[in-house]
């Protein structure tokens, strides 16, 4: 990683969680949550444990909202939104588009977001008051104004088995009116790559 968090206490925790995810890449167990295609691995759970432990240690009054655990209520209006492994299906299939995400909410409003691209070793930071950065360098979104030329990133929700036909109709309309569609399996990285001018929307 080429930079540190503004909230530096969590820097080592993110690196430790990322190392754990890498180390477990060829030795993990998989379970399904609400849907057959909504997976969780023991790597998700171990990475989450590392992040929650660090937040509890350094920011004991902050709340924690994590994908795999019960919510910890805040006593000061600050909460951390955690996804310890965004792109679990990718991870389970040895596709290296996965990320750790941390978002700081103040009075339920996001003010800072950190996304660590584990296998590319890139840190994306977003701030409500000063924009987005990749490895400390300011990002510039696309200047493309033509929808017909725009490259769009998208994904399908986990309830696609129930609403698949509706999603396909929407997807078809996007295909017909844009320059192309890409789907990489990590919503967090899709957003970061949009901020980094890899996608137009």
Task: Go through the PLM ranges and name each one.
Residues 140-201:
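An extended, acidic
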Residues 21, 44, 55, 88, ...:
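Residue-level signal for inorganic ion chemistry
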Residues 74-133:
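DPxDG-like acidic metal-binding loop motif
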Residues 1-85, 169:
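N-terminal subdomain of lithium-sensitive/metallo-dependent phosphomonoesterases centered on the IMPase/IPPase/PAP
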Residues 45, 49, 68, 84-87, ...:
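Generic detector of well-ordered alpha-helical packing
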Residues 32, 72-74, 107, 143-146:
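Solvent-exposed alpha-helices and their adjacent loops that cap or buttress functional pockets
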Residues 110, 138-140:
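Short, solvent-exposed loop/turn motifs
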